[in-house]
Amino acid sequence: MAISYSSGIGRTKNSSVGIDRLRIDFDSNLRRWFGRNIGLWHSRSQYFFDEEKAINLEMYINISKLNQGDSGFESYRFNWWCEDEKDFFIKRPTYKSKGEIIAQLQGHQLIRHSSYLSDSSGISNIRQVDEHELIFESNYDNWHVLEHTRLIDQDKFRSRTIYSWFNDKLKIVENHHETRIKNPN
């Protein structure tokens, strides 16, 4: 892909330099944003399923960066667990009370080895709203998931809102307020 621009003298020139520079800036911004999320988080979440009453749940999320390896892409490990599981996971077996997802950042996509609602691998397309917020859009096993994640107050807090459609019907809306417990930086 090339960008056309005018030199101001009536001629148009093509350049891929502009696109390459934009791609480098975008990739650097994404790596920096993911780096800001590394650490242990306490998540207070509220789930809305169809017409049911809201359900509150607390869990912990630990995000760590893995060694880059030969691929040249940055990889991350997402671990989560609940200390008080209640009956939330018994009533909803597609949800996991603990688990791990390994994901690799490749350009504007996050390649997940598994997904939260499924063991299937998946690709999340990433859009950057500003330096503090990303939007992830994923499709796997008839699920369409839209997640907004925003870092707040110099990365002490995160706000996540997740909308999940199954077979084109909105099934789950989640609100997560997360507080950083441990920052390895």
Question: Language-model segments: what does each one mean?
Answer:
Residues M1-K98, I172-V173, T179-N185:
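Amphipathic/hydrophobic helical signal segments and adjacent flexible N-terminal regions
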Residues I38-H42, F73-Y76, H108-I111, V129-F136, ...:
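Short, hydrophobic/aromatic-rich segments at coil-to-beta transitions
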Residues S45-Y47, S115, S138, T161-W165:
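Beta-turn initiation residues at beta-strand->coil junctions
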Residues N56-E58, D119-G122, W143-E147, S159-R160, ...:
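Short, surface-exposed coil-to-beta transition loops
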Residues L66-D70, R127-E131, R150-K156:
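A short, structured loop/turn motif at beta-sheet edges
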Residues W80-E137:
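Contiguous, well-ordered beta-strand patches that form the walls/edges
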Residues E133-E137, D141-H148, I152-F157:
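Phosphate-end processing signature that detects enzymes handling 5′-triphosphorylated RNA
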Residues H148-F157, T161-N185:
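Edge beta-strand at a domain terminus
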